[in-house]
Amino acid sequence: MIRSLHITSLGIAALAAAIPCRAAGAAEISVAASATPLQAVVDAAAPGDVLRLAPGEHLGPVVLSKPLTLQGEPGAVLKGNGKGSVVTLTAPEAAVRGLRVEGSGTDIATLDAGVFAAASATRAVIEGNSIIGNLYGIQLHGARDAVARGNRIEGQREGRTSRSGNGVSVWNAPGAKVLDNDIIFGRDGIFANASKKNEFRGNRFSNLRFAVHYMYTNDSVIADNVSTGNIVGYAIMYSDRLQVSGNVSDGDRDNGFLFNYANGSKISGNAVHGRAQPVERWTSNGQRFAADPDTPKVAGEASAPRARTRIGPEKCVFIYNANKNRFSDNLFEGCEIGVHFTAGSEGNAMSGNAFVRNRNQVKYVGTRSLDWSSEGRGNYWSDNPAFDIDGDGLADNPYRPNDMIDRVLWQAPAAKVLVNSPAVQVIRWAQARFPAVFPGGVVDSHPLMKPDGIKETETP
């Protein structure tokens, strides 16, 4: 049975006296805003109680050492004292919902956070909160099967990115889920380390270093997330057997996706969109990049003349020593380089992807020949001037995104002045007619005539 109680700072002693007389089951306790620390109310509550915090300011920090729920009414603020974490969960099935949480400490070594879920806080739920201006937003520090869902997490706006914390950090928390959160500012949106069987789905990221940063985290799902205007969208490192699907990188700076020692994973249905971006994004020297000054500040206000720009991401995908992965049905468009593929990466399959309007579709400097088609299905290349006489949807000739001259230009950029020389044109003519002249590299033996079910961004 659930009973409703109302408590102010003057009623804490009365609550403590009433607890032995409480009917079986949890109580729902209304807590008025007060200058008295909330911890006293928490200490007096019984396991299973719901503490419903009224609008106004409630003083932290607070530790939930029993399975309680902090439920905020609209306008309820839980404010820390600038030291340590604002809320620390140490009990199984503890929950924090509907609160504005602010005022953590600033010590990176002690992982000061808006909400910190310890290893003992299994199945903790952190849902529907606004977690604003803390060093770390949410720490799932060993909290198995914990869930962070539907929160707005805003990190520190000022100072160097390297001195900020992450929106959500997951360390050794098998089964933890991070779902449908909005994460802006700070260092990384989600940082996972030494974990497994996690699910990161439906989150939105902006103004960060990495939207998702994965380290030593296996058998997990990264799906349906959106990264906008970050330095790197999705950095997947030292992790195996991942499902990476339905994610978007839109206007990130360096890489849409980065795979470093990531193995045995399926990467499908993702999209990377390159954009012209202000050059200041590359020259901020670690400081936070202010909003594009060309963007109107008031609705209807005319834009100023556009500053110098360059294309970002520089690489839609960077694959470094990543092995036995399958890339299928992804869209890579508008980047300086579609895919930068290193020679140390082996056994990867590429099919059904669309490479659209990248200045260089592929950069591969190895000498081994790689066929980027699988079971008679290759990829779509927007710069492939091909014919399909038999109408089977496949180009009649193989497609090679690079040639010998490209390799020379990567190794000696100054040679660019010779690109239109007669000697270079003769070499390219010979390569086109005598494939044996090619020194190895990427070839798509069954290129697609159109992007299979992948919608390109319309150009103005």
Regions found by a protein language model. Name each.
Residues 27-57:
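Acidic Gly/Asp/Thr-rich repetitive segments characteristic of extracellular carbohydrate-active
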Residues 39, 43, 47, 58-71, ...:
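Extracellular beta-strand-rich solenoid/capping regions of secreted or surface-exposed proteins
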Residues 52, 63, 71, 79, ...:
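Extracellular beta-strand solenoid repeats
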Residues 21-26:
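Boundary at the C-terminal end of the N-terminal hydrophobic targeting segment
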Residues 271-320, 325-460:
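Functionally critical loop-and-helix segments that line ligand-binding/catalytic clefts
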Residues 9-20:
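Bacterial N-terminal signal peptides
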Residues 80-88, 108-117, 132-140, 160-172, ...:
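Extracellular beta-strand/beta-solenoid scaffold signature
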